[in-house]
């Protein structure tokens, strides 16, 4: 059908000569150390104006493009004043173009950041089609296919249509038959839909214009200065006047590759991003999905050699914006992946080059993969890649580091919110999936940055207090560069196609992590694709490296699966060899769990962010001990006078306090995941040494976790800080653009501590966890011990409501209350949760409902007994608290007259 739309004499001899010459030209910067071999045609260059023709269409062509600057390239362009025209020969009609969109210059807010790619996992494939006297811009449907020429392919054509985005009038015809169109109706619009990130703004065509335009033999690069207008009522700190917000958008357009690349089938045991398609020519019993991993095309220069350089290496350019002091650490992190590629058969698969200070290419160019350093003030790092949506071949990748990534003292540590606490511990019920770089609708940026900054702040605080003389500049630099190398390795892994593996840090013991001989030879975590915390041990314990920046066995295995050359030449022909590689998944060091295994309610207690070691309880105890050691010294160390005699800032004390509190809370939350836990495995039946898909955490381990939480999370002792400390937790006193006002200048002690307690309590009493505890009783053989729902409720009540039965005889005063204020807050929260479960507040678990109602009845009986004791003279606050609790419980019991009984 497309052929019928094309003119029979599409190309003149002159055009054929031009195309041959263009195709013979080298790819810009393909394999050479020089920045760019293919010289772009530029509107600012010395290209000659287009010539006019004698025929009528050619005369129109000559008039239209008189004095225009021609930019020969993949798509010939003509720039004239504020107009930009494209000349589409018939040979380009029906071809598939890959369109990459990115932000060349942003506003430093709302994800509109310079260097940011647009449309993660939703890359555009366009066609230009001639319909009558117009050219249509069509976005292709690429997810559904069938074998060409088969009956199923006809059915697919009937079932799924492409999307016609634009229809542009043909303005003129060139002497060679090319169709000239104005590109403004296509690109001088809100094509990337950025207005969605700017509520109250709309695209302002009258204030938008073309920026830099470049044309190469293999791609064209278009920049648009897109202005979005508003009434000015909205304030954006980084924009001088919100009545006009200008964002520089870059479009990189190239032909979708037609090369020797062989897609590789994905396997759920190995963590790659995938390109998922539906093949309707398959005869299958299950779904019709064909899943290819996302990876680069690597071919051996010498196919017979066991280890050979690639024909074309993966080249990353360190952008000239990267500070000199950090370039060696970044280079080390990127080049470290060559160890894995060598074991897959490639020598020097990845090359790192430094962008010169003066160069004529841009980082957004599809021909260049870059490590970019930006200053958006949002403190993040990310490593997205752009792939051929038909094959999974990675075509372009850029690692982006924000300069504030290394700013580990942050104002948000001054006061926490339930939302910020949830973000540090895997999200909450109903939160969107935290799938870094995963595909449409997935989180566009790797969320490593927030936790890494907190971990660095923890290390700086702990070392300042525990190390004699405080944290030296040398140790501080070591801490930062070790962490920077590890993060560079992590983000580079994403650009190679790898997903997160949150089981990486859970194999070895804490003792192994602190044995530098082991970590410097064999690494620490089994994968750098985990979120690895800083390794800081309590004073008096053996201390290893802060970060172990080495690839782990999982990383090497994953690269083998994705990149090892295999015989066959077709995806299905590789299946047998791929199965041999993936079949090793039962080896403990190759365990894999990713984002969707590590969210709120997920069962595996060994799949965590920022955990360290094989024992979550040991790690939680170590963190609790560290916090207890460091907390008393933070005022002296964080606000002490510096060597110049200048006074310290109290907000640093408050920030350090917040970091320590969150360190304690996060570790306890991870330990709480043992309760109702199931250790998961992605291994397939028949894999060597493979565990079953689920293994119930032993009752003894679950009880150990509950005992730990009773003391370290629900007890008052961990939060019994000195009054002097509380009175020195001052907030930042600056108030101007770029700063946020805290809710309270003094520290909201009760609120923040209760937020962390509620986070753990919410986990333990979550309907999904309660359902698993009940289900697990059936998953454990009858002759083995199991933690029951009844025991869980009983243990929680004893931990949280201990004073009901354990208040000793005596007289209590307001300064020495029977129940302190922190415990009173926790008890109110617990009773509220029990009440909600008893009233069947969406649990769907009748056993939990009955047990919660039973606990409330027991509490009423205990409260009656305590309030009636003559030898226990309660102070007014504790008595009022207990009376109020009883009244609340009775309202629940009275309202639910038919509440079940255990």
Each language-model region and where it sits:
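Stable alpha-helical elements in mature extracytoplasmic
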Residues: 326-333, 480, 484, 488, ...
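Auxiliary tRNA-acceptor-end handling modules of aminoacyl-tRNA synthetases
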Residues: 31-322, 340, 344, 349, ...
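Bacterial N-terminal signal peptides that target proteins for export
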Residues: 1-14
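Sec/Tat signal peptide C-region and signal peptidase I cleavage site
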Residues: 27-29
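Conserved catalytic/binding loops enriched for acidic/polar residues
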Residues: 474-479, 504-902
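Sec-exported extracytoplasmic/periplasmic mature domains
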Residues: 335-346, 494, 498, 534, ...
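Bacterial N-terminal signal peptides
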Residues: 12-24
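The catalytic-center signature of Zn2+-dependent metalloproteases
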Residues: 354-374, 482-538
């Amino acid at each position: 059908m497309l052929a019928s739309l094309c003119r029979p004499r599409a190309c003149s001899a002159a055009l054929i000569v031009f195309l041959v010459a263009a195709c013979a030209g080298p790819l810009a910067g393909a394999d050479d150390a020089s920045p760019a071999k293919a010289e772009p045609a530029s509107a600012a260059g010395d290209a000659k104006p287009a010539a006019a023709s004698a025929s009528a269409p050619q005369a129109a062509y000559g008039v239209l493009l008189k004095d225009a600057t021609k930019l020969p390239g993949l798509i010939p362009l003509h720039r004239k004043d504020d107009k930009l025209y494209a000349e589409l020969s018939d040979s380009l009609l029906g071809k598939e173009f890959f369109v990459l969109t990115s932000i060349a210059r942003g506003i430093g807010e709302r994800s509109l950041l310079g260097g940011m790619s647009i449309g993660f996992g939703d890359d555009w494939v366009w066609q230009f089609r001639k319909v009558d006297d117009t050219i249509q811009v069509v976005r292709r449907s690429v997810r559904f296919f069938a074998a060409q020429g088969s009956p199923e392919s006809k059915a697919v054509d009937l079932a799924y249509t492409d999307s016609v985005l634009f229809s542009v009038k043909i303005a003129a015809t060139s002497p060679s038959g090319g169709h000239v169109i104005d590109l403004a109706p296509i690109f001088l619009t809100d094509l990337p839909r950025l207005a969605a990130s700017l509520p109250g703004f709309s695209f302002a065509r009258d204030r938008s214009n073309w920026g830099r335009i470049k044309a190469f033999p293999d791609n064209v690069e278009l920049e648009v200065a897109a202005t979005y207008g508003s009434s000015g009522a909205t304030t954006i700190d980084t924009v001088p006047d919100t009545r006009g917000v200008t964002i520089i958008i870059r479009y990189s357009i190239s032909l979708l590759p037609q090369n020797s690349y062989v897609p590789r089938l994905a396997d759920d045991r190995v963590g790659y991003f995938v390109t998922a398609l539906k093949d309707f020519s398959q005869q299958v019993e299950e779904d019709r999905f064909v899943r290819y991993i996302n990876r680069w095309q690597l071919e051996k220069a010498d196919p017979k050699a066991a280890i050979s350089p690639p024909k074309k290496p993966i080249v990353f350019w360190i952008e000239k914006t990267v500070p000199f002091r950090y370039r060696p650490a970044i280079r080390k992190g990127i080049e470290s992946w060559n160890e894995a590629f060598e074991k897959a058969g490639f020598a020097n698969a990845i090359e790192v080059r430094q962008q010169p200070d003066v160069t004529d290419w841009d980082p957004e160019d599809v021909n260049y993969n870059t490590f970019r350093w930006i200053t958006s003030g949002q403190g993040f790092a990310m490593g997205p890649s752009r792939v051929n949506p038909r094959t999974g071949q990675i075509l372009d990748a850029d690692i982006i580091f924000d300069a504030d990534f290394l700013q580990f003292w942050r104002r948000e540590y001054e006061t926490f919110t339930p939302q910020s606490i949830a973000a540090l511990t895997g999200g909450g019920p109903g939160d969107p999936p935290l799938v870094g770089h995963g595909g449409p609708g997935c989180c566009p940026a790797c969320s490593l940055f927030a936790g890494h900054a907190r971990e660095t702040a923890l290390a700086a605080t702990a070392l300042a207090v525990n190390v004699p003389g405080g944290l030296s500049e040398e140790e501080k630099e070591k801490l930062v560069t070790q962490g920077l190398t590890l993060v560079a390795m992590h983000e580079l892994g994403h650009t190679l196609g790898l997903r997160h593996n949150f089981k990486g840090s859970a194999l070895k013991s804490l003792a192994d992590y602190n044995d530098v001989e082991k970590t410097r030879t064999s690494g620490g975590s089994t994968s750098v694709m985990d979120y690895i915390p800083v390794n800081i041990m309590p004073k008096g314990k053996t201390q290893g490296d802060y970060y172990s920046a080495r690839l782990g066995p999982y990383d090497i295995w994953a690269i083998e699966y994705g990149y090892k050359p295999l015989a066959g030449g077709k995806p299905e022909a590789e299946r047998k060899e791929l199965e041999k590689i993936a079949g090793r998944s039962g080896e403990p060091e190759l365990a894999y769990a990713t984002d969707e295994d590590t969210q709120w309610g997920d069962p595996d207690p060994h799949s965590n962010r920022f955990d360290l070691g094989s024992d979550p309880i040991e790690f939680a105890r170590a963190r609790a001990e560290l916090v207890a050691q460091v907390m008393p010294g933070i005022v002296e160390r964080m606000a002490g006078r510096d060597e110049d005699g200048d006074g310290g800032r109290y907000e640093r004390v408050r920030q350090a306090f917040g970091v320590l509190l969150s360190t304690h809370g996060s570790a306890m939350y991870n330990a709480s995941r043992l309760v109702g836990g199931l250790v998961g495995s992605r291994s397939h039946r028949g894999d060597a040494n493979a565990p079953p898909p689920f293994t119930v955490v032993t009752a003894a381990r679950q009880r150990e976790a509950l005992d730990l939480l009773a003391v370290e999370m629900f007890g008052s002792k961990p939060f019994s800080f000195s009054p002097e400390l509380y009175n020195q937790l001052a907030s930042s006193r600056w108030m101007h653009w770029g700063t946020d006002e805290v809710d309270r200048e003094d520290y909201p002690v009760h609120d923040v501590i209760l937020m962390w307690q509620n986070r753990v309590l919410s986990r333990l009493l979550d309907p999904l966890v309660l359902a698993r505890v009940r289900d697990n009783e059936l998953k454990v053989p009858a002759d083995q011990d199991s933690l029951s729902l009844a025991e869980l409720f009983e243990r929680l009540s004893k931990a949280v409501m201990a004073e009901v039965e354990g208040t000793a005889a005596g007289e209590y005063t307001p300064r020495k209350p029977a129940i302190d204020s922190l415990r009173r807050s926790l008890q109110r929260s617990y009773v509220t949760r029990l009440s909600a479960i008893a009233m069947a507040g969406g649990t769907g678990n009748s056993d939990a409902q009955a047990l919660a109602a039973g606990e409330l009845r027991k509490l009423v009986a205990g409260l009656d007994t305590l309030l009636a004791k003559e030898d226990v003279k309660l102070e007014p606050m504790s008595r009022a608290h207990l009376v109020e609790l009883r009244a609340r419980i009775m309202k629940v019991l009275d309202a639910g007259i038919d509440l079940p009984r255990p």
